[in-house]
């Protein structure tokens, strides 16, 4: 059975963009409050009082449009992936589509699959454009993740997102998709029930049965189907709930950490959930050279992974400077203390 996912028409990334809020809190500051002295990351991004997954998605989408240099009316789909969208009943995609000027001739939907909701939207965009149904489609992954006060997730749950505009492969695409593959099972490693404010995690399922099993199987199957090895890739971006997990995956697969570090941002902005690998790939595209090949593997609890192989094209040299680069946002910082952080994240119950 053919496992590789590849559309009828070759497609690529016409434009991409990321956004990370400027506020930061040091892991040490969170640890001070809860009496913890060892931390999985250095610091994380915190959304401002007027920011949420929707506003992050809009900023990322606008940056993607700047690089794409296309009329937003040509975008026939705006698909938004998040597990922290601001409305329980009301699509976020419609607001983003309106904000960027893509309405009314456009399909919109909100995708959910924990931390791989954004790449799930991307898989759909690839198929939508690759089938000939549309010239362009936009996929966005963004989150303002929450962690229960004092829980280890509070140290890593960050904020940020990225958007990718998919179009038919041409001289205008900054990178093209060689193929993709999705690997999914029913694994209860992480969940949040309706009306609950904070997620829960099934500790014994978190590592090996969920994250490592799915990412490694997705990566290996994609490479086997494409006839590639780890040596054929110049960069690798894996889902990054922390710094340790993606580096462990790289070691298991035999990928030098030097190929992983450029897209590994969790240590300085936190885990951006649906935005994690998408923000990482945007950072890699900001520095990659034409001909570079990128291995991109997401993970979403519940559980599943999407794996992509993309090859950078000549257009990247011109387009990368048309919008703020990912590290421009990462390096733009304003530190806050735990009291302001708790206020911004609405942890105070009045």
Swiss-Prot record:
Signal peptide: none
Disulfide bonds: none
Pathways per UniProt: Metabolic intermediate biosynthesis; (R)-mevalonate biosynthesis; (R)-mevalonate from acetyl-CoA: step 2/3
Pfam families noted in UniProt: ACP_syn_III_C
Annotated positions binding CoA: 204, 244
Catalytic activity, EC: 2.3.3.10
UniProt-annotated binding residues for (3S)-3-hydroxy-3-methylglutaryl-CoA: 115, 156, 206, 239, 271, 301
CDD domains given in the database record: init_cond_enzymes (cd00827)
Keyword Protein biosynthesis attached: no
GO biological process, one term: farnesyl diphosphate biosynthetic process, mevalonate pathway
Keywords: Acyltransferase, Isoprene biosynthesis, Transferase
GO molecular function, one term: acetyl-CoA C-acetyltransferase activity
Active site residues per record: 83 (proton donor/acceptor), 115 (acyl-thioester intermediate), 239 (proton donor/acceptor)
Record SUPFAM superfamilies: Thiolase-like
Catalytic activity: acetoacetyl-CoA + acetyl-CoA + H2O = (3S)-3-hydroxy-3-methylglutaryl-CoA + CoA + H(+)
Quaternary structure (record): Interacts with acetoacetyl-CoA thiolase that catalyzes the precedent step in the pathway and with a DUF35 protein. The acetoacetyl-CoA thiolase/HMG-CoA synthase complex channels the intermediate via a fused CoA-binding site, which allows for efficient coupling of the endergonic thiolase reaction with the exergonic HMGCS reaction.
Function of the molecule: Catalyzes the condensation of acetyl-CoA with acetoacetyl-CoA to form 3-hydroxy-3-methylglutaryl-CoA (HMG-CoA). Functions in the mevalonate (MVA) pathway leading to isopentenyl diphosphate (IPP), a key precursor for the biosynthesis of isoprenoid compounds that are building blocks of archaeal membrane lipids.
Similarity comment text for this entry: Belongs to the thiolase-like superfamily. Archaeal HMG-CoA synthase family.
PANTHER family listed in its UniProt record: 3-HYDROXY-3-METHYLGLUTARYL COENZYME A SYNTHASE, HYDROXYMETHYLGLUTARYL-COA SYNTHASE
HAMAP family: HMG_CoA_synth_arch
Protein name, as recorded: Hydroxymethylglutaryl-CoA synthase
Lineage of producing organism: Archaea, Methanobacteriati, Methanobacteriota, Thermococci, Thermococcales
């Amino acid at each position: 059975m053919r496992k590789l996912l590849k559309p009828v028409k070759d497609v690529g990334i016409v434009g991409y963009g990321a956004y990370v809020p400027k506020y930061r809190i040091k892991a040490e500051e969170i640890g001070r409050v809860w009496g913890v002295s060892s931390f999985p990351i250095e610091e994380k991004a915190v959304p401002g009082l007027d920011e949420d997954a929707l506003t992050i998605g809009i900023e990322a989408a606008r940056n993607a449009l700047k690089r794409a240099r296309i009329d937003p009316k040509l975008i026939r789909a705006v698909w938004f992936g998040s597990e922290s969208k601001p409305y329980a009943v009301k699509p976020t995609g419609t607001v983003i589509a309106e904000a960027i000027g893509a309405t009314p001739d456009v399909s919109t939907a909100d995708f959910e699959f924990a931390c791989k909701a954004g790449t799930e939207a991307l898989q759909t965009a690839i198929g939508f454009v690759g089938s000939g149904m549309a010239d362009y489609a936009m996929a966005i992954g963004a989150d303002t993740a929450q962690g229960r006060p004092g829980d280890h997730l509070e140290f890593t749950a960050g904020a940020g997102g990225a958007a990718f505009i998919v179009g038919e492969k041409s001289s205008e695409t900054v990178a093209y998709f060689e193929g993709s593959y999705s690997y999914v099972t029913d694994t209860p490693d992480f969940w949040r029930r309706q009306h609950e404010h904070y997620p829960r995690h099934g500790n014994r399922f978190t590592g090996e049965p969920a994250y490592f099993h799915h990412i490694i199987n997705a990566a290996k199957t994609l490479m086997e189907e494409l006839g590639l090895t780890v040596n054929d890739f110049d960069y690798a971006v894996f889902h990054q709930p922390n710094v340790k997990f993606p580096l462990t995956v790289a070691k298991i697969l035999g990928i030098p950490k030097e190929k992983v570090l450029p897209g590994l941002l969790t240590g300085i902005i936190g885990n951006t959930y649906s935005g994690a690998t998408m923000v990482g790939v945007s950072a890699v595209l900001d520095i990659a050279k034409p001909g570079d090949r990128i291995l991109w593997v997401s993970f979403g609890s519940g559980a599943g992974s999407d794996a992509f192989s993309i090859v950078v094209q000549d257009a990247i040299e011109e387009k990368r400077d048309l919008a703020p680069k990912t590290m421009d946002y990462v390096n733009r910082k304003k530190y806050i203390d735990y009291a302001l952080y708790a206020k911004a994240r609405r942890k105070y119950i009045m």
